């Protein structure tokens, strides 16, 4: 494929005309903080505000970005543009002040699209796996000497960051379908991992509308662009022939362009053989589960298209250090005489939970799996209630907390307690309802048994609770 001049030198402060000072409202969000860091490193004046301090705001402050807490109208003074995420409401005082002062208000995805306009953009979309896949793509391209810029929705453990400004011509970015904002992006290459029923509130509850939006996203590719699609996903398999662009498929299916065979998992490491036409080569990825084999295949497909050599691909996948809250190993915990392994994962959709549970069963056969699940959003709990009840029934022991609302009003019946009742009625496992995460700290030690693998799951505050459990009860190896 060919493209125009995408030299990083073109993304200078003068590339945005008169705009030199960018103010981020909600700068502590994963997607926002990453873009802010890249723009700061490009030489723009970046400021931001958020409700409270977190790891992202601390990192940005350490880089020299001015971050304030609370939202006040005078925070936007001096800004040439104000960047907001979809979580920021129109009545936010900083947004209102920006409009009053005629300061442009730009959505996060629009700003990402502007960064992508000056580089060879590689956008990774999909309902599940996009953060891991984006991270793998960035890691493989970096190992191949391409030094990409990346903006990721999770924190790469290798760099302790969501973003990095590289000297190369490639920008690897996670593309968010949850609010349809990925339609702002116009990449040269697009990866789609899967299309599943989630965030349907954005699409009027209509899955066909969600599917159509992914179709539209793929047609934002230039006529010489490339769509990299998972051939194992039935929706993408059907959608592929409709895409009037070059398509490269990957997966386990025999008719995929790039596929994995001879898959073996041991603990968190997975080995397989890549078949790419007449070429075959072995790979070991430092991630567990067949779903992560698919994510690795997507990264390999991108790397092969950009002529990264096989040895670099193999090194990057073998050395991959993972992402925060994606099967994050917190090590051994001790509750009295019981010693358990604690793993924390962002999985919050039935399909993600099923994939993670399968990875645990395959990598740690014979271990009792104690799941601690925090449902995320009342709307998702309502829409996928029976699917949640079915997949969570596969745990050997189960604790369920109240729903993490994420700003949503309660929905009758779509509660943690209601989910426990539905799971109990299935008769496979007897769940324990835990009202709060503070209560979890007291209840879990009494439920855990020696040798358990404790798996905390959810997209809300459960990750912080897992870290607190590790802080209170963690032991050194051999301790």
Curated annotation (Swiss-Prot):
Superkingdom of origin: Bacteria
Catalytic activity: UDP-N-acetyl-alpha-D-muramate + L-alanine + ATP = UDP-N-acetyl-alpha-D-muramoyl-L-alanine + ADP + phosphate + H(+)
The protein's Enzyme Commission number: 6.3.2.8
Binding positions (ATP): 126-132
Cell division listed as a keyword: yes
EC primary class: ligase
Function: Cell wall formation.
Identification of the protein by name: UDP-N-acetylmuramate--L-alanine ligase
Organism field: Alkalilimnicola ehrlichii (strain ATCC BAA-1101 / DSM 17681 / MLHE-1)
Upper taxonomic lineage: Bacteria, Pseudomonadati, Pseudomonadota, Gammaproteobacteria, Chromatiales
Gene responsible for this protein: murC
């Amino acid at each position: 494929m060919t493209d125009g001049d995408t030299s990083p030198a073109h993304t200078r402060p003068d590339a945005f005309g008169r705009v030199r000072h960018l103010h981020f409202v909600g700068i502590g969000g994963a997607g926002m903080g990453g873009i802010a860091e890249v723009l700061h490193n490009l030489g723009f004046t970046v400021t931001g505000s958020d409700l409270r301090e977190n790891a992202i705001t601390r990192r940005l402050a350490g880089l020299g970005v001015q971050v304030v807490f609370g939202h006040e109208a005078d925070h936007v003074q001096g800004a040439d543009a104000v960047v907001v995420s979809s979580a920021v409401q129109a009545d936010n005082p900083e947004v209102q002040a920006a409009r009053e002062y005629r300061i442009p208000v730009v959505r996060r995805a629009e700003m990402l699209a502007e960064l992508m306009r000056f580089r060879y953009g590689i956008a990774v979309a999909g309902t599940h796996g996009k953060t891991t896949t984006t991270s793998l793509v960035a890691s493989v391209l970096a190992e191949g000497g391409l030094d990409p810029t990346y903006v990721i929705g999770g924190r790469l453990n290798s760099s302790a960051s969501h973003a990095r400004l590289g000297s190369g011509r490639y920008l690897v970015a996670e593309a968010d379908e949850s609010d349809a904002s990925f339609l702002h992006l116009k990449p040269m290459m697009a990866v789609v991992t899967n299309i599943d029923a989630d965030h349907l509130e954005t699409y009027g509850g209509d899955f066909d509308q969600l599917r159509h939006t992914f179709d539209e996203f793929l047609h934002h590719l230039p006529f010489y662009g490339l769509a990299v699609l998972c051939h194992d996903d039935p929706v993408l398999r059907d959608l592929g022939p409709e895409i009037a662009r070059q398509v490269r498929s990957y997966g386990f299916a025999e008719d995929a362009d790039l596929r994995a065979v001879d898959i073996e998992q041991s603990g968190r490491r997975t080995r397989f053989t890549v078949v790419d036409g007449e070429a075959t080569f072995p790979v070991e990825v430092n991630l567990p589960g067949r779903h992560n084999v698919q994510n690795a295949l997507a990264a390999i497909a991108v790397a092969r298209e950009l002529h990264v050599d096989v040895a670099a691909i193999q090194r990057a996948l073998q050395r991959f250090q993972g992402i925060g809250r994606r099967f994050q190993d917190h090590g051994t915990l001790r509750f009295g005489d019981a010693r358990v392994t604690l793993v924390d994962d962002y999985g919050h959709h039935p399909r993600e939970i099923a994939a993670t549970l399968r990875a645990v069963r395959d990598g740690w056969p014979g271990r009792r799996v104690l799941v601690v699940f925090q449902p995320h959003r009342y709307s998702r709990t309502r829409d996928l209630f029976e699917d949640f009840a079915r997949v969570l029934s596969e745990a050997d022991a189960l604790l369920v907390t109240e729903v993490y609302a994420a700003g949503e009003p309660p929905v009758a019946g779509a509660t943690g307690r209601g989910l426990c009742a539905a799971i109990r009625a299935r008769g496979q496992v007897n769940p324990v309802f835990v009202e709060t995460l503070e209560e979890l700290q007291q209840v879990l030690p009494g439920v855990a048994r020696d040798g358990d693998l404790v798996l905390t799951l959810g997209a809300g505050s459960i990750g912080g609770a897992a870290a607190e459990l590790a802080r209170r009860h963690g032991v050194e190896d051999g301790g």
